[in-house]
Amino acid sequence: MAVKGFRPTTPTRREMTMCTFEEITTSTPEKSLLVSLKKSGGRNANGKITVRHIGGGAKRKYRVIDFKRNKDNISAKVVSIEYDPNRTAFIALVVYADGEKRYMIAPVGLKVGDTVVSGPESDIKVGNCLPIRNIPVGTVIHNIELAPGKGAQLVRSAGNSAQLMAKEGDYSQVRLPSGEVRYIRVECRATIGVVSNQTNEIVNIGKAGRKRHMGVRPTVRGSVMNPNDHPHGGGEGRSPIGHPSPRTPWGKPALGYKTRKNKKYSDRFIVKRRHDK
């Protein structure tokens, strides 16, 4: 899919780019698969900000996505490829032979009229979902489960894909988009192909207002705050931060400080970390 620019009617429009959405076939979602979303503004039940930089944005409905793909051996026909405001990837509306409708993450190359199937006996074809045990080594996959039957949790955003590197016993080795190689049980399911909307990463937002439409509020530098708001705040004019190294708003070391727990259960499943050369 291509990326289009705009005439420079304003300085920000000069740099702004947008997807052309050529793959999208309809602008009307399936009503039976919509759920209302209530905005939190980043606040918890007590009204306190627990996540910064969240607020405003256009209204949106949540599209219920089938991440489990557990309707085995029943073919489903792709009816439409749609835009989803809740994720970077496009979604596909599929209708099963028994009449049930579901949304799934659309992979690259999936078109209206195509047929997809789930189950251990499915063909190795784009959009089909099957256990890793039945997928050949070297296959490009996405929508990967971490626990059998739980639903896909890995490799779901636009343009992403993982590769099946090896299979041994009850576990397989999968190389994730970050470069991390991880053990995943062979009973876990994955979908064949690459996630759609590959040009998403080269889109230039261009202006602050477009980010506000997405529900993202400004990020203020700590050095321009007051000392009671941030460890970098205070001083006359452009002052140094007053610390040997940068700090987070809560006083913890920033920039390079490892935040992952030292003794995490899932450490045993990581074969190669993403930072290892």
Swiss-Prot record:
Residues 219-277 are annotated as: Disordered. NCBIfam families: rplB_bact. The keyword Transit peptide does not apply. GO terms for molecular function: rRNA binding; structural constituent of ribosome; transferase activity. It holds the Pfam family Ribosomal_L2_C. The lineage of its organism: Bacteria, Bacillati, Bacillota, Clostridia, Eubacteriales. One of its GO terms (cellular component) is large ribosomal subunit. Belongs to the universal ribosomal protein uL2 family. It comes from the Bacteria. It comes from Clostridium botulinum (strain Okra / Type B1). Part of the 50S ribosomal subunit. Forms a bridge to the 30S subunit in the 70S ribosome. This is Large ribosomal subunit protein uL2. One of its GO terms (biological process) is cytoplasmic translation.
